[in-house]
């Protein structure tokens, strides 16, 4: 499981 949280 890959979680990507952008900062925008």
UniProtKB/Swiss-Prot annotation:
The keyword Transcription does not apply. GO terms for cellular component: extracellular region. Signal peptide: none annotated. One of its GO terms (biological process) is flight behavior. This is Adipokinetic hormone. Belongs to the AKH/HRTH/RPCH family. The keyword Secreted applies. It comes from the Eukaryota. GO terms for molecular function: hormone activity. Transmembrane segments: none annotated. The modification Tryptophan amide is found at residue 8. The modification Pyrrolidone carboxylic acid is found at residue 1. This hormone, released from cells in the corpora cardiaca, causes release of diglycerides from the fat body and stimulation of muscles to use these diglycerides as an energy source during energy-demanding processes. It comes from Namaquaphasma ookiepense (Gladiator bug). Keywords: Amidation, Flight, Hormone, Neuropeptide, Pyrrolidone carboxylic acid, Secreted.
């Amino acid at each position: 499981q890959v979680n990507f949280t952008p900062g925008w």
